């Protein structure tokens, strides 16, 4: 694993490897914050943790370059904690195990954390290199981006000093992002009083798994399967045809990841167990056919389990199943003027039912505020009909594109000069912190770019080694050629 430190450019890869050894799942950032502060002290640059738990670093201009515009390099320190079903990894205590697989860097059994660890590693490389030529440089390494962009949302006004912001959280080398979608978290809850299970009933845990999952913004347009939405189809028919009752449900664990696994414990008359298992096999065949060419590993597994003492009341069960069934999931609309770009979507990310409580979590995204409001009200209507309480949180606006951006055209020119190709200007459906930061610092000139990564937020996350070196070359060259104020 340590051979990753020897990849080129070593200044980035050694820092990235060091980051993989520091636990940093969203919500548990104390260790990585201290790691970054210790790094800054060793590098001899000013650094502090701000009231929003972000880490800010400042490096003065190189001699003779003091009049250049100040640049803020921005990335987020947290990572999405996903692991394979068989993994025993503890994200709060264990290091990630990166490894080289041909042209890619991957992780063993978990997310890699290249989103956004490679961006942080590049910032570290800039901060510690005394030979680079640049104007004033700041680093803004934000907290808890993956769970609600809390570090950016709580960023104090007046803290940053720069004129240009380079966000290093994009995942397609050669593409320069100048706009992104806004988003909002929607949580629907319903408490209920459990009822006793029929003492003669059996219980079966039905699991849908083996789906690809993925980033609910960047990959929502691919039509990947959502384990929660597949499972509800099976469960509803089991209730109707096998006299099944719902005892519990658990599906998904991250608001911004497409769920790749969901499971429900059903109780039912013992004589209907065989019919349930046959029904599950029929649904598996349907799912495999539906997702041909998209999902290759779908599994539907039925496992006999101990019969729980309590289950969901029938009326509440039916309301919850209707809510899950009716909840919109996936693309709502493409941008009419850019039909290849998603405008509005929703992701039924997390379902937890059991013990007298139920909760559904959805992340809705849109580049239009009116359409974001539309999908929120659509989902509210669905959940209200089921008697659920609906709350929204973490709303952030979209990042409006500025195709006349001075830093954009500098990057495009230097990309062409360095690599002989034209860069691609892009608007992403993913949420980036740029929109929130621009709301607090509207004078900033902002572009996002980075090396190529695939399948972020999943256990197949990987970084393309060959794109990190040119990314580093462009970043250095851009800092050197930033214009004067």
List where the protein language model places each region.
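Acidic/His- and Gly-rich active-site-bordering loop/insert found
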Residues: 3-103
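A short beta-alpha structural unit
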Residues: 17-21, 264-265, 299-311, 347-351, ...
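Active-site metal-coordination/substrate-binding segment of hydrolases
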Residues: 65-136, 141-147, 152-163, 185, ...
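Acidic-enriched catalytic cores of C-N bond-cleaving enzymes acting on peptides and small amides
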Residues: 179, 196-201, 220-250, 270-345, ...
